[in-house]
Each structure stands twice: as structure tokens, then as C-alpha cells.
């Protein structure tokens, strides 16, 4: 059985996170990913010091929001806790699952580790099933290169049916392409891709 909003648990969205938008038309972007993929480095690279930290409603789990802008859009980035799956088994995973499913984000960026990409694809595929506007950011391409691992970003994009961007988040300029794709998705210019559909046995 595939993931649906209803299958994630009744009442999961009872306590909503307050999103601090700089303007009414600012886009909300969830930053998701497995632990230790450089997700917070992407967050810090995009938002700099323009961020706010606190706790998720009813949780001791830390929450970080930050603002970044392009010439086309303003964004509120929400750095959600690292998780391997939307099937929650801890408070952190529950927070991540609930925000992806119920948080109303305009886009979800799933950050992946280029050195162990296969392990990251479970969360990517689950997120594609739930959300309409998903971007995959393959981070740590420099480390992958050192390990003689080559990631074919174009083929990955073709297979997944969603935009795929490569990055070395420690180098801020490499995040410009991610911002450009975020703008395109916000403007409805994501192309004519059809997101991958997972078939499950009866």
C-alpha cells in the first residue's frame, strides 16, 4: 500500500507550526533529508543569518526557519528534522512526516548524499508520492568525486520525473542552481515531467 495523507495517522496536524512569512506571497519550502546529508548546511547557505530557531509545537524537537530571496520570489525555508522514512518511529521523524504531509509547504526540497544515494531514495520516493512540487538536491558531489562515484543527475531526473540539482553546499555559489529551480517550480515552469509512480503488490 502506498502512502496517503490519511494513512499517516489521524490528528497528526492538530498543532500547527507558525510560519514567519516576510510577505503574504512568500513561498514556504520544506528542507527534508536523511540525517547527515548536509541539509542544515544547505539551509545555512541559503539563509545566512536570516533565520529563527525554536521548538515544534508540543515537542522538544528544535525547529529552524530562515528567509532567502531571489529577484523573482521570497522563500521561508523550514529545516525539518532528518528522517529516513515518512513512517515515523521517533519524535523527530513524526515532526518531519507531519510537516511534509500536513504543513502546506509550496515546495519540498529533499537533500541527498551523493556518496550513498541509493539509501536516500526511499525518502525521495515517499515524498514524491505525497507532495506535488518536489525538488531533489544531490549534495556532497565533491566527496562523491573523491570516492570515484559519478552521479548522472540528468538520468536521475528522467527516472524520478522531478527536478534534480547537484550541489556542494559548503560552496554557496553551487546553491544558485537550486534557487533557480525553486523559482521555476514556483512559477509553474517545472516542465512536462511525470513523477515516478510506485507499484505495490496487492
Where are these regions (language model features)?
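Conserved G1/Walker A P-loop phosphate-binding module
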Residues: 2-88, 103, 107
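Conserved nucleotide-binding/hydrolysis micro-motifs of P-loop NTPases
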Residues: 49, 58, 82-83, 114-118, ...
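Helical mechanochemical/support elements of P-loop NTPase systems and associated helical scaffolds
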Residues: 57, 61, 76, 88, ...
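Conserved C-terminal guanine-recognition region of P-loop GTPase G domains, centered on the G4
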Residues: 66-72, 95-165
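Canonical P-loop GTPase G-domain recognition
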Residues: 142-196
Amino acid at each position: 500500500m502506498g502512502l496517503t495523507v490519511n494513512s499517516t495517522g489521524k490528528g497528526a496536524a492538530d498543532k500547527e507550526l507558525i510560519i514567519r512569512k516576510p510577505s503574504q506571497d512568500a513561498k514556504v519550502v520544506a528542507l527534508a533529508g536523511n540525517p547527515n546529508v548536509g541539509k542544515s548546511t544547505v539551509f545555512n547557505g541559503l539563509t545566512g543569518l536570516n533565520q529563527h530557531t525554536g521548538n515544534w509545537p508540543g515537542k522538544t524537537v528544535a525547529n529552524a526557519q530562515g528567509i532567502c530571496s531571489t529577484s523573482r520570489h521570497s522563500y521561508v525555508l523550514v529545516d525539518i528534522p532528518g528522517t529516513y522514512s515518512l513512517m515515523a518511529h521517533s519524535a523527530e521523524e513524526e515532526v518531519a512526516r507531519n510537516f511534509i504531509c500536513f504543513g502546506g509547504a509550496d515546495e519540498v526540497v529533499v537533500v541527498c548524499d551523493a556518496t550513498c544515494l541509493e539509501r536516500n531514495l526511499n525518502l525521495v520516493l515517499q515524498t514524491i508520492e505525497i507532495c506535488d512540487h518536489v525538488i531533489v538536491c544531490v549534495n556532497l558531489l565533491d566527496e562523491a568525486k573523491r570516492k570515484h562515484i559519478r552521479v548522472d543527475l540528468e538520468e536521475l531526473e528522467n527516472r524520478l520525473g522531478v527536478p534534480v540539482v547537484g550541489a556542494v553546499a559548503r560552496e554557496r555559489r553551487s546553491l544558485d542552481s537550486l534557487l533557480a529551480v525553486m523559482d521555476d517550480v514556483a512559477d509553474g515552469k517545472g516542465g512536462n515531467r511525470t513523477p515516478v509512480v510506485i507499484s505495490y503488490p496487492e
